[in-house]
């Protein structure tokens, strides 16, 4: 991955994310916000206590995704997604997202927001131990 793409990837921004449909096998693309916290890339959403979003189900079935950068640079970046369920791991990431969005309901987000962490094969920053 070239330096311009790496730099763009590590700026919190709106992206498109492609997952593979768990039942159909068809590619599914959504617009969502990508966060960077000290080199760790993660994606979250607003709390929905009534259901789990389809894209989370898709990632659980097949963690291979594509991040589509579309703001300062255009690039399609393959990645592996991991659904984060442990509250202790979720809390600092949800706190960062809440702060960025001007929200104060961190505990609600910890309990009910979708959260995935991304690993990008060609990016040393997302592959830290």
Give residue spans per PLM region.
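Short, structured beta-strand-loop surface elements
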Residues: 48-123
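A generic structural micro-feature
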Residues: 9, 24-26, 59, 110
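Short low-complexity stretches enriched in small and charged residues
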Residues: 1, 31-38, 69-76
